[in-house]
Amino acid sequence: MASDKVKTFTDSNFDSETSKGLVLVDFWAEWCGPCRRLAPTVDALASDYEGRATVAKMNVDENPDVPSRFAIRGIPTLLLFKDGQLAETIVGLQPKEAIAATLERHL
């Protein structure tokens, strides 16, 4: 189960939710094994960075428009936005420390 600190983004709220601050978005799907393995890491990052960065998930099956716009071909993919601009792309299952280091570079 997702942490209550992890937001859920949709095609309709994505642009407004990523427009300000540092926002990490996990693109995932129910059927994706690596996505399920990444979920606890995403939950932990949401807790660790609470107040400094927003952490969110976006189901690619339920929301196809945004993943298409960013040419997401494989999941899990994490996109990091800073004030509405794409700052970093992380593809595949990565350790928490690597994702945290990416966040730290933009704080």
Residue ranges and their predicted role:
Residues M1-S16:
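N-terminal "domain-start" segment that seeds a small globular fold
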Residues T18-W28:
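Short active-site neighborhood of thiol/selenol oxidoreductases, capturing the structured segment around
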Residues V23, P64, F70-L79:
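Structural micro-motif
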Residues R36-E50:
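Typically the conserved alpha-helix immediately C-terminal to a functionally engaged Cys/Sec
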Residues K82-L107:
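Non-catalytic, surface beta->alpha helical segment in thiol-disulfide oxidoreductase systems
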